[in-house]
Amino acid sequence: MAQSNWEADKMLDVYIYDYLVKKKLHNTAKSFMTEGKVSPDPVAIDAPGGFLFEWWSVFWDIFIARTNEKHSEAAAAYIEAQQGKAKEQQMQIQQLQMMRQAQMQRRDPNHPSLGGPMNAIGSEGMIGQSNASALAAKMYEERMKQPNPMNSETSQPHLDARMALLKSATNHHGQIVQGNHQGGVSAALQQIQSRTQQPTEIKTEVNLGTSPRQLPVDPSTVYGQGILQSKPGMGSAGLNPGVSGLPLKGWPLTGIEQMRPGLGGPQVQKSFLQNQSQFQLSPQQQQHQMLAQVQAQGNMTNSPMYGGDMDPRRFTGLPRGNLNPKDGQQNANDGSIGSPMQSSSSKHISMPPVQQSSSQQQDHLLSQQSQQNNRKRKGPSSSGPANSTGTGNTVGPSNSQPSTPSTHTPVDGVAIAGNMHHVNSMPKGPMMYGSDGIGGLASSANQLLQDDMDQFGDVGALEDNVESFLSQDDGDGGSLFGTLKRNSSVHTETSKPFSFNEVSCIRKSASKVICCSFSYDGKLLASAGHDKKVFIWNMETLQVESTPEEHAHIITDVRFRPNSTQLATSSFDKTIKIWDASDPGYFLRTISGHAAPVMSIDFHPKKTELLCSCDSNNDIRFWDINASCVRAVKGASTQVRFQPRTGQFLAAASENTVSIFDIENNNKRVNIFKGHSSNVHSVCWSPNGELVASVSEDAVKLWSLSSGDCIHELSNSGNKFHSVVFHPSYPDLLVIGGYQAIELWNTMENKCMTVAGHECVISALAQSPSTGVVASASHDKSVKIWK
């Protein structure tokens, strides 16, 4: 229609008329056009069902998703995608702000602001000229008064003085405050450059080969991969003008070190790469931190490890730059690119607080800041009873011994900020507290010499300090998961409160779901049951494909082949079928030979051609999936599961016992776990393969493979148990499926919590160590994802 007819008050009439026409309601459309005086000009609306229909569909999906997310998974995914885009855009804006601040500092080197924007990701604003920054500025000015000649025949005392200057400038501003210290470090370095008359051109952008869209979307993590921002390097005496120690487009400059003729030792130029996403401190805490550093600096002035007495030979263990024989320029890279913590070549940064009395006051400040951060950061915490996010119900600590049944109270939802020591959330090894707070983790390229480390004593005490610093509570043991530790072999993300929440609900089955299984990379989830076909879910897009109903009866178990998209299904029709998830339209082969319904299957973790199955007649068969049955034994009628990683042992459930078979020793039965008073429904292995959990209606038992004893037991309190699996991130936590509810059992403290799960029996549980999620399948025809 003509442009003049597109007034705001006419738009709705135009859309309604277009909708009626495309719905072929021509008489109604004609009447509406006449009465509403709608323009007869053609409407340029590119929507097959009419713009009104398109608009209403999107509106309704979003509306119903916000009121009841179970009604529209597509809308919920749309909202989640929009939130992700918003976070991504925010990260780009923050990166832009930091780059702009760096440019402003380079344009105005005559007015450095040592108390400048030391803000977290540039969002906290200026913190002002505090007492700490004034003290730091004064000490910096005193050091700048020292002579620093430019000739190449510099004497050894002058070299020592330059190294002291390097260390003081590095450590005065080497705070653990999150963010890139644009004001402090950049201005200080530019002041050095102006006094030595060595303008250094630094590229603002340090590109690590990834686009801004690949930056982390959660800036609140304590140790996320941060945005690396370039800092002007220190122009050491003897370096040619314009030389930068920064990497070129993110790639480290090659080569090792250079020695200027006449110098008593190597000259080291560091590129200051800060991790944006380190410990978060408020502006007031930043001031306390800075003041503590200045005081600690004053106490350590006479230390042989600090200041002008620094032996230049201590730099020999550091990564070296490249010697250019043409102009003698040095390109040094400290190997800290991509490192999760700030690296430093200063030796004193590795001093543990337990050995240095001068940093006791700062440790006190750090402990206070840690407590303040925990109070701000964590959700509902519990030093005694555990709180839930959904209701006011609480669970108190259990006084029962680990070998006795524990009692528990249902709680709707879990978000416990207990004393969760995440074992490897901070790397262990030569990482220690220094007088500047948290020291850097020396990489393999710049580890300190072993003899320098000997004086620091046992590192074990330090690791305790790190864990207590990262803990979310006082560690009094009163919280539900007070001593729960994260699986160090899989998860290295930051310490955060434990939570177990439903993140997705999948409803595609028309009948009961009996089994589910993750692929080894966690990207696919297969579920099956009374539908006699397998539903295969893409965990990234939640798109689903299904196999045809090739089985004649219900499917009892489904398992993925290790490191493959192939999977196997067992059925009441006495057969096993092999499928490929990448092309599920038809099965690859059928394995026959059982004389009774096949109840369970499992692939060997290493010998991926080997498949084990059991039937209701207590027969266990081992198959070569490309050939036939290779051997058979008696001993399982419910479930079979190989020991993870090695596959040396097989756990087999039959009636009320669990048998352990040694696969590498002619399938010899090496142990029988007895103790259940009713039939065992499910078994699972701990991640390290040293424990076996078995579940029956009345109890869950945890068995030691080495001793054969039941070391922990949980009796039900009215909720009949049916399935069990170890939590993928916390190896001491068992996830138990019962009737409608999921039990979370901390085996170390023998405490339990109940989470509302499904509307019927939770028939199976699966977990993915790769993604840290748990899947639950139920007779209510749904599969839920938990994390």
UniProtKB/Swiss-Prot annotation:
Residues 299-413 are annotated as: Disordered. Residues 77-106 form a coiled coil. GO terms for molecular function: transcription coactivator activity; transcription corepressor activity. InterPro entries: G-protein_beta_WD-40_rep (IPR020472), LEUNIG-like (IPR044716), LisH (IPR006594), WD40/YVTN_repeat-like_dom_sf (IPR015943), WD40_repeat_CS (IPR019775), WD40_repeat_dom_sf (IPR036322), WD40_rpt (IPR001680). Residues 380-409 have a biased composition (Polar residues). Pfam families: LisH, WD40. Residues 336-346, 355-372 have a biased composition (Low complexity). Keywords: Activator, Coiled coil, Developmental protein, Differentiation, Flowering, Nucleus, Repeat, Repressor, Transcription, Transcription regulation, WD repeat. Its main location: nucleus. Expressed in roots, stems, leaves, seedlings, apex, flowers, siliques, flower organs and seeds (including seed coat). Residues 8-40 form the LisH domain. Disruption phenotype: Strong defects in seed mucilage extrusion; no mucilage capsule formation and slightly irregular columellae in seeds. Altered structure of mucilage that accumulates abnormal levels of substituted rhamnogalacturonan I and methyl-esterified homogalacturonan. Increased amount of most sugars associated with an increase in methylation of the mucilage and/or primary cell wall pectins. Reduced MUM2 expression in seed coat and embryo. Shorter roots. Enhanced tolerance to salt and osmotic stress conditions. In plants lacking both LUG and LUH, embryo lethality and abnormal flowers. Residues 1-88 are annotated as: Required for SEU-binding. Induction: Induced by exposures to biotic stress (e.g. nematode and Botrytis cinerea) and abiotic stress (e.g. salt, genotoxic, wounding, drought and oxidative stress). Repressed by exposures to biotic stress (e.g. Agrobacterium tumefaciens) and abiotic stress (e.g. hypoxia, cycloheximide, 2,4-dichlorophenoxyacetic acid, AgNO(3) and aminoethoxyvinylglycine). It is found in: Nucleus. SMART domains: LisH, WD40. GO terms for biological process: cell differentiation; cellular response to external biotic stimulus; DNA damage response; embryo development ending in seed dormancy; flower development; galacturonan metabolic process; meristem maintenance; mucilage biosynthetic process. GO terms for cellular component: nucleus. WD repeats lie at residues 508-547, 550-589, 593-633, 635-671, 675-715, 717-755, 757-787. Forms corepressor complexes with SLK1 and SLK2; LUH is the transcription repressor subunit and SLK1 and SLK2 the specific DNA-binding adapters. Interacts with SEU. Binds to YAB3, YAB5 and YAB1/FIL; these complexes promote adaxial cell identity in leaves as well as embryonic shoot apical meristem (SAM) initiation and postembryonic SAM maintenance. Transcription repressor subunit of the SEU-SLK1 and SEU-SLK2 transcriptional corepressor of abiotic stress (e.g. salt and osmotic stress) response genes, by means of an epigenetic process involving histone modification (e.g. H3K9 and H3K14 acetylation), probably by recruiting HDAC, to facilitate the condensation of chromatin thus preventing transcription at the target genes. Can also act as a transcription activator. Implicated in embryo and floral development. This is Transcriptional corepressor LEUNIG_HOMOLOG. It comes from Arabidopsis thaliana (Mouse-ear cress). The gene is LUH.
